[in-house]
Each structure stands twice: as structure tokens, then as C-alpha cells.
């Protein structure tokens, strides 16, 4: 049994095949960095146009690879269903019409996928085992959340950002520092040359016992420091280091509170920012000290990808969560706690 997965929620176009016996047998992704880099951020209209061209290329490529063209008997035998992201994400990027057309042409059902749930399950894809129930830190360009996952489809948001997501703040500060897009990794690379303690930035909302985050004030504060500092490489490195430490410390403090509140064995970390080296080091220390088990997504699954979509589609197909209805709806503001199985 094979599931075709498609991911287009933001600026990565990705297609994958998950097989019941063999696992992830194919995974192809095209980014749009060259399209958006000169704007230092994602331009929704350009992202939408790029998806149409890139998805067509990837589908042709993956079908040709498995000799699916001009085959009279593959319709029912090769793919059992098409799983694709319906939200959250950029409205123009979620190309459900193309995905539904593929399902209709193959006469197979489709599976609606919550992009955030895909990120959570990317950790289970990485380790190839069931980790429910678990606590999770989801940190990406658009999301910063602490989540209690009871079982497949049942997720409780314990805390989330009240304004900016961690990844967004990383990219914003990277832009102010004059670094290229995408900025998060470039900022972390620059921070390696910084001297710790040259600056001290606030750890927002860490004096509160709730699990929510807020980074807009920190973002503005660091921006003002940059604009009033010298343009030297060392000065930029020092600011980058202190900023990264402030972000990571804030996440760690909130994770510590979550661990005390929810008594489960497994702690999962996912999303693009989960590949951050400093975050991984400090989380390992925290989880080891509290005698829990820590699981990260493989780095190739940290950013947006269809591997996690196909895998989640496989799990949902096994539970009968698929449809033949002619729905073309998208859900740009979908929450991890929303149930879309039968929409």
C-alpha cells in the first residue's frame, strides 16, 4: 500500500511516497529561495506561481520514475490515496485543486492533512515508531507552540506565541543584520563568532507560570540595538549570539514548565527551528535532567516536506480517515487542535 503525499503550504514544493512495508521510498523537494531572496522574505503571489510550475515538474518526475505513465493497471494498484496539506499556510500556496485533480484522475480517495500535525508526526517518521502520548515543542517560521498529543488526531495546545513566531523573529533580525534569506541559519552561523555576555536581551514572559510566548518586544528591542551599534563583523556576531541565547533560554524555561505540568515520558521537537544547534544542546540537558526521552525530527524533515504528509496520510488511511467527496476547501488559519478528518 502506497500513499502519495503533497506539501505546498508556504514556499517549499514537495512530493513523497510512503509505503506500508518499505516506509518512505521517495521524497523530492524544491525550494523557492532564489525567487524570494532578493525580497528578504516570502512573497505570497510569487510563491503561489512557483508552486504550480514546481508541482507539475515533481509529479511528472515521480510518475516517470515509477513508470506510471502509459500504464493501464496502475490506477488502483500503485497509490491507495493522495494526502495533501489543506492548512495552515498561505492561501495561494495551498494548491488543493491540483491535488484533487490527481486523486480524481487516478480514481482514488484523498486525505486532508493538517500541516502542523504533519510536523508533529515527522518525528515518528524519523524514528519509525509510535511515540504517543507525548509533549511537543513546535517551532517554525509561523508557529511556536507547546502541545500535548494524546493520540493520533487529539492535540491540546498548552501554550503558544501571542504575536511573532520564533522562526519569523530569527528571519527579521537576520534581515536587520544584513544577512541573506532564509535568515535563521545565517544568523546562527554568525552567532558562533560572537562573545557571550556582550549584550543581555530579555527572556520575555518567563516570569509567568503560563506556557505562552511573546517575541514582538524582544524583536523591537534587538532591532534598536542593531541600529545603534557599529556595523563591524564582531559587533554583529555578538548581537546575534546574545539574541539566539535569549530565544533559546525562553524556549527552555517554558519547556521546563510544561514538563512539570504534563507527566508523559516522551518529549518531541519539530519544525524548522528545531534544527538549531544551541536549542538542541540545551534541550538535551533539560530532558536528561528530568529523566524523559527526547526525540528530534531528522534535519531533512525539520523544514516543510511531503515525507511527513505522506506518512501522516498513511496513518489516517489505516483508520479510514479518507474521502471521495468533491471538496476544494482550504484552511489557512487551521489550528493543530482542529479536526479536519471529515471536512
Curated annotation (Swiss-Prot):
Keywords: Acyltransferase, Cytoplasm, Iron, Metal-binding, Transferase, tRNA processing. Its cofactor is Fe(2+). It is an enzyme of class 2 (transferase). GO terms for molecular function: iron ion binding; N(6)-L-threonylcarbamoyladenine synthase activity. Substrate binds at residues 138-142, 171, 184, 276. Its EC number is 2.3.1.234. Its main location: cytoplasm. It comes from the Bacteria. Binds 1 Fe(2+) ion per subunit. Coiled coil: none annotated. Fe cation binds at residues 115, 119, 304. Signal peptide: none annotated. Pfam families: TsaD. GO terms for biological process: tRNA threonylcarbamoyladenosine modification. NCBIfam families: gcp_kae1, T6A_TsaD_YgjD. Belongs to the KAE1 / TsaD family. Required for the formation of a threonylcarbamoyl group on adenosine at position 37 (t(6)A37) in tRNAs that read codons beginning with adenine. Is involved in the transfer of the threonylcarbamoyl moiety of threonylcarbamoyl-AMP (TC-AMP) to the N6 group of A37, together with TsaE and TsaB. TsaD likely plays a direct catalytic role in this reaction. PANTHER family: TRNA N6-ADENOSINE THREONYLCARBAMOYLTRANSFERASE (PTHR11735), TRNA N6-ADENOSINE THREONYLCARBAMOYLTRANSFERASE, MITOCHONDRIAL (PTHR11735:SF6). This is tRNA N6-adenosine threonylcarbamoyltransferase.
